[in-house]
Amino acid sequence: MTATLERRESASIWGRFCNWVTSTENRLNIGWFGVLMIPTLLTATSVFIIAFIAAPPVDIDGIREPVSGSLLYGNNIISGAIIPTSAAIGLHFYPIWEAASVDEWLYNGGPYELIVLHFLLGVACYMGREWELSYRLGMRPWIAVAYSAPVAAATAVFLIYPIGQGSFSDGMPLGISGTFNFMIVFQAEHNILMHPFHMLGVAGVFGGSLFSAMHGSLVTSSLIRETTENESANAGYKFGQEQETYNIVAAHGYFGRLIFQYASFNNSRSLHFFLAAWPVVGIWFTALGISTMAFNLNGFNFNQSVVDSQGRVINTWADIINRANLGMEVMHERNAHNFPLDLAAVEAPAVNG
């Protein structure tokens, strides 16, 4: 009888825990995805803060030339970063217990791998948590679908690209100037500016900013005015009313006259679908572009594609970009290569004899 009561008590504790996790009444929703999201994001954030402040220099290129990234080792907020895991580690799973000492783990950039893997798990669970809360509230799932765009982008630069290049040392550093360095080297090695998927991403981000500003300003400019207690609520907008707070007909009429009639949405659902889909699809394409360039399927190469009748090259902007790419390529990781990768990739001429 005692054992039976204990089982019931333990079951009720588990049941209460399940009810608490899945409840939609909590001030902050937990959800089953949150059970994994909370510890992974807390771990990633804590290690990031500690490493950004105090981590020793990291041998990123695996050539015994450590690069400093933390504040206590001479950096500021702009130049500081979590330095990627050493090329000597490659793609190996490198937790603390795999190193001979904590000093070795820090020297080889172990914190980067720890932060990135916990962060990616955490943001994926955040996306799952968005879906879970939507599901429990009877909503449609498109919030999580929209969030999949930045999740895909982060996964591309922190995981897919290192996998394609063979080392976590090629991942994006976790800092401001480190991000710029990653972008410059990526352009040098993959010609990303000439990749159509990157162009779609630029259109998505800039277009999304434009459409967001247009929508917000139009709605704000066509708000129905708030009424006072001395006039009828029918005369304008009353705080807290359930109906739409702006006049979409007025906004449609204004914008239709500003551009032309069919450039303006008169359907609120179509408008908001467009506002969500434009940047999301653009960022999806950019993430896909990074993931294909990870395996060296690079941007278009139009180098020396225009020649005169004598066969002499007439430079185009593609040739100017190519010259810049070569300059950036020979300058990065300057002590890790004896010659640029473009020269190294050429097969040696056959020798007959």
Curated annotation (Swiss-Prot):
It catalyses: 2 a plastoquinone + 4 hnu + 2 H2O = 2 a plastoquinol + O2. A quinone binds at residues 215, 264-265. The D1/D2 heterodimer binds P680, chlorophylls that are the primary electron donor of PSII, and subsequent electron acceptors. It shares a non-heme iron and each subunit binds pheophytin, quinone, additional chlorophylls, carotenoids and lipids. D1 provides most of the ligands for the Mn4-Ca-O5 cluster of the oxygen-evolving complex (OEC). There is also a Cl(-1) ion associated with D1 and D2, which is required for oxygen evolution. The PSII complex binds additional chlorophylls, carotenoids and specific lipids. Residues 345-353 form a propeptide. InterPro entries: D1/D2 (IPR055266), Photo_II_D1/D2_sf (IPR036854), Photo_RC_L/M (IPR000484), Photo_RC_L/M_CS (IPR055265), PSII_D1 (IPR005867). GO terms for cellular component: chloroplast thylakoid membrane; photosystem II. PSII is composed of 1 copy each of membrane proteins PsbA, PsbB, PsbC, PsbD, PsbE, PsbF, PsbH, PsbI, PsbJ, PsbK, PsbL, PsbM, PsbT, PsbX, PsbY, PsbZ, Psb30/Ycf12, at least 3 peripheral proteins of the oxygen-evolving complex and a large number of cofactors. It forms dimeric complexes. Belongs to the reaction center PufL/M/PsbA/D family. This is Photosystem II protein D1. The gene is psbA.
